[in-house]
Structure formats: structure tokens, C-alpha cells
């Protein structure tokens, strides 16, 4: 029975740990990448970058029901970020259709600060994007599916000095959907049923 209980716990743990995610990401001017649930109560910092000409690469495991969060901060001039992602649910990219955003009321980019903003909610759809190789940034993640995006304006007007409403603070972008699906109840039922059959066969063999 101890072995069966161990197998059951192992099966549940495997279902909860949904799989590997790889992210190639950059932002003008800097970013912090998190994963966690929709409420932001278990955010994990996965990486950060502070040089927009550089595409940063990250690889990590996500849990079932996890979303990805990009906290991005501009320091003046044009503003945007770009990403190509491989997740358990498939390929994801930076574009205005796959993400939502909120603007922080302060400049606290600590994990606690980001979590507080996520908990406050108020998500909206981002408005601004341009092609992956657009000026002044060029193709940093080298994938034509990855747009340069921002929540209100890319800041390309007025000599690349069009202000954003998040100037002086920062914006948080979250995937529309979880990047690792939560297993259906039937999946757990099938796992338990299969293990129960193994237990019954084991008992029958022992009795024989």
C-alpha cells in the first residue's frame, strides 16, 4: 500500500509540474520576468534584463495553471518589449492579442511590488505594436512572429519622444491564458483508476 500511495503522489506531482518553458526576451529599457498563478500569490522571478539591444534567454519549469508576467520599465524615449516563448501549451509571442497589462502606480519593481499590482487587477488590452524588425530596435529575438509591443504608445512620434502613461513607473504584462494547462478532473480520475487496478492485480497475485 505504501508503494501504491507513493505512485499516486508521484502521479499528482507530475501532473502539477506541467513542463519546461523557454523565453527569449528583451525590453527598452529593462524587464523582470515572472511566472505564477493568475492572482499573483506565488510569483517566481525567472530572470531580468537591463540592456535592450540584448536578447536574454531563460529556461525553467512551470506548474499547471501558471501564467507568464513581464514587468517592463522605460527610461525615456521609445518604449517596447519583444519575446518569443516556447511553453507547454505551445509557442507564444509578444503581440497585442496574447497579453493583457496593468500600469503600476509606483516604481516599486520588487517581487512584492509586482505581486501587489497583480492582486489589484484592472487588466486591459495593450494598444501598440510594430513589426519584429522595426526601427529603432531591429530584430532582437530574431523571430518574425514576435512584435514589439507596449500598452499605449511605442513613443515613435515627436522625434522618438512620445511619452507613455507609464513613464516614471512601469507596466506589467501577463499572458491572456495559462502557459501550462490545468489537468481535467477526468485525467486525475484515470490516473487513480489505473493505479487502483495495479493495486488489485498486486493483491490478486499475492493471494494466489
PLM regions and their residue ranges:
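Accessory carbohydrate-binding/adhesion or oligomerization-edge regions at the termini
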Residues: 26, 63, 69-180
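Short, threonine-centered small-residue motifs that mark membrane-proximal processing/anchoring sites
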Residues: 5-20, 176-195, 201
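Residue-level detector of intrinsically disordered/flexible regions characterized by low predicted structural confidence
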Residues: 4-5, 207
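Beta-strand-rich ligand-recognition modules
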Residues: 30-84, 115
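Short N-terminal segments immediately surrounding and downstream of signal-peptide cleavage
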Residues: 21-30
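C-terminal membrane-anchoring or membrane-association module
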Residues: 199-208
Amino acid at each position: 500500500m505504501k508503494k501504491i500511495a507513493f505512485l499516486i503522489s508521484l502521479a499528482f506531482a507530475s501532473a502539477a509540474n506541467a513542463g519546461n518553458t523557454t523565453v527569449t526576451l528583451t525590453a527598452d529599457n529593462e524587464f523582470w520576468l515572472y511566472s505564477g498563478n493568475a492572482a499573483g500569490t506565488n510569483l517566481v522571478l525567472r530572470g531580468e534584463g537591463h540592456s535592450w539591444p540584448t536578447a536574454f534567454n531563460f529556461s525553467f519549469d512551470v506548474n499547471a495553471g501558471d501564467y507568464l508576467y513581464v514587468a517592463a520599465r522605460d527610461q525615456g524615449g521609445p518604449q517596447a518589449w519583444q519575446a518569443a516563448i516556447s511553453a507547454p501549451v505551445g509557442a507564444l509571442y509578444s503581440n497585442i492579442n496574447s497579453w493583457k497589462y496593468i500600469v503600476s502606480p509606483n516604481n516599486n519593481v520588487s517581487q512584492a511590488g509586482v505581486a501587489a499590482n497583480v492582486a489589484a487587477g484592472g487588466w486591459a488590452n495593450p494598444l501598440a505594436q510594430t513589426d519584429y524588425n522595426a526601427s529603432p530596435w531591429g530584430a532582437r529575438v530574431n523571430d518574425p512572429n514576435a512584435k514589439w509591443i507596449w500598452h499605449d504608445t511605442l513613443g515613435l512620434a515627436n522625434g522618438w519622444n512620445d511619452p507613455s502613461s507609464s513613464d516614471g513607473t512601469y507596466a506589467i504584462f501577463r499572458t491572456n491564458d495559462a502557459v501550462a494547462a490545468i489537468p481535467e478532473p477526468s485525467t486525475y480520475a484515470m490516473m487513480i483508476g489505473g493505479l487502483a487496478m495495479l493495486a488489485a492485480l498486486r493483491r490478486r497475485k499475492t493471494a494466489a
